[in-house]
Design a protein with these regions (language model features):
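Residue-level marker of beta-strand positions
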Residues: 119-121, 132, 176
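Mid-domain Rossmann-like dinucleotide-binding core that forms the NAD(H)/NADP(H) cofactor-binding site
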Residues: 116, 153-228
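Adenosine-nucleotide cofactor-binding segment
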Residues: 195-273
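Cytochrome P450 core scaffold surrounding the K-helix E-X-X-R motif
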Residues: 49-54
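A structural motif shared across PLP-dependent enzymes of the aminotransferase-like
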Residues: 125-138
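Short, intrinsically disordered, charge-balanced linker/junction segments flanking boundaries
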Residues: 271-281
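Glycine/charged-rich beta-loop-alpha catalytic/anionic-binding loops adjacent to active sites
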Residues: 139-149, 175
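Glycine-rich beta-strand-centered segment in the early N-terminal region that forms part
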Residues: 30-45, 57-125
Length: 281
């Protein structure tokens, strides 16, 4: 019998008959092997990549609470036009959750595993939406003494994404960055990293409150897309920073078009040679 009899896990399933199901089911926690530990999960973020697995197939206007195979579940319809896109996972019960943090409550016999007993660690590797996760000790990053799990639960996905933005900028020879939805958790990390590494950043937000978050961090070019002078300020910021690479976290809408248009106009302000085909942006 497992030493964690009440352990549970979240599963996501798209059924053959066009339903999207999120169910909470019992989970048999395996005994940790020599170099493994059991982490009792305390904080797990929801990233867009997680949402893609959890709810991308669902028409959320149809969501309802049901009991499926004796387990509590949220059920939503999958529109007929969407069903072909999810045929590859139809009928498959999938686990979700990229990363998270919690306390080590059991450990294998190795020195490395035993050294983590009782410590709060952050981990990555999928299947994190469960009460307990078995992981190799070498995959666990201990948090500082006294640090709560929620402070370390996003240690991997967003920080690596922010660093990836800057690495891409440098690899492609750009001078600065544009980022939308810039007051998000990722956006704040990117802002701090850009300030630390001297990378010009133009941050696009949608409210005064979001703007204040970033100006308090120290950013200079924070532009509210809801204001009438948005395009004028965007062009001016791009002309000043020379930013020619954008990462659009919104998806859909016209923002990407606005940014590219502003980049063209900013290039003209900076004295780019005229071409009927536009600039090299």
């Amino acid at each position: 019998m497992s030493q964690f009899p009440d352990a549970k896990q979240l599963f996501t399933t798209v059924t053959e008959d066009g339903k999207s199901i999120l169910s909470i089911e019992p989970y048999a926690v395996p005994e940790p092997k020599e170099h493994e530990v059991v982490v009792q999960m305390e904080a797990v973020p929801i990233n867009p990549s997680d949402l893609g697995l959890l709810t991308a197939a669902a028409n959320m206007d149809t969501v309802r609470s049901e009991t499926v195979d004796g387990h509590p579940a949220l059920v939503a319809d999958v529109e007929p036009a969407m069903q072909p896109f999810f045929k590859g996972r139809a009928g498959k019960k999938l686990a979700a959750g990229n990363e998270g943090a919690g306390k080590v409550v059991a450990a294998g016999s190795s020195d490395a595993a035993q050294a983590l007993m009782g410590k709060t660690v952050t981990i990555v590797g999928g299947e994190m939406y469960r009460t307990h996760r078995v992981m190799p000790a070498m995959m666990c990053v201990p948090l500082p003494e006294g640090a709560p799990a929620k402070e370390g639960a996003s240690l991997f996905v967003n920080p690596m994404t922010a660093q990836g933005f800057i690495n891409t900028m440098r690899a492609e020879g750009h001078e600065g960055l544009v980022h939308t939805a810039a007051a998000s958790n990722l956006g704040q990390m990117l802002a701090k990293l850009c300030l630390k590494e001297g990378v010009p950043l133009v941050a696009i937000v949608r409210s005064d409150a979001q703007k204040k978050i970033l100006t308090d961090i120290g950013l200079t070019h924070v532009i509210d897309s809801t204001k009438d002078d948005f395009m004028d300020k965007l062009i001016a910021a791009l002309a000043e920073t020379g930013a020619t690479l954008g990462f659009d976290a919104i998806g859909g809408g016209k923002m990407a078009s606005y940014i590219l248009t502003a980049m063209e106009k900013a290039a003209a302000v900076r004295g780019a040679e005229f071409s009927v085909y536009g600039s090299t942006v």
